[in-house]
Amino acid sequence: MNDRKRAVQARVYGRVQGVGYRIWTRSEAAGLGLVGWVRNERDGSVTAWLAGADAAVSAMIERLRQGPAGASVSRVEVEEIETWTAPGDFRIVA
């Protein structure tokens, strides 16, 4: 069994604010057993910080590319985080 842990910061662009993207992200991430946070950015994008099992993080990145109904994702930029301390749950922070 692969229990490798991974953390990433993903920036999601497109029509991702005002469509329930953060609430959807929190629900999807929690369902995959991930911890982290999601927030709106001033430029209209959304940033998500995700940590957990490697396979779950990869699955969540794919889900971010799809987004919830009403969203239209144009691109997702992913940055690997080498050193991290995870919060105990998944939160909407802004």
Swiss-Prot record:
PANTHER family: ACYLPHOSPHATASE (PTHR47268:SF4). It comes from the Bacteria. InterPro entries: Acylphosphatase, Acylphosphatase-like_dom, Acylphosphatase-like_dom_sf, Acylphosphatase_CS. Belongs to the acylphosphatase family. It catalyses: an acyl phosphate + H2O = a carboxylate + phosphate + H(+). Gene3D superfamilies: 3.30.70.100. Keywords: Hydrolase. One of its GO terms (molecular function) is acylphosphatase activity. The active site is at R22, N40. Residues 7-94 form the Acylphosphatase-like domain. The keyword Lipid biosynthesis does not apply. It holds the Pfam family Acylphosphatase. The keyword Hydrolase applies. Transmembrane segments: none annotated. Its EC number is 3.6.1.7. This is Acylphosphatase.
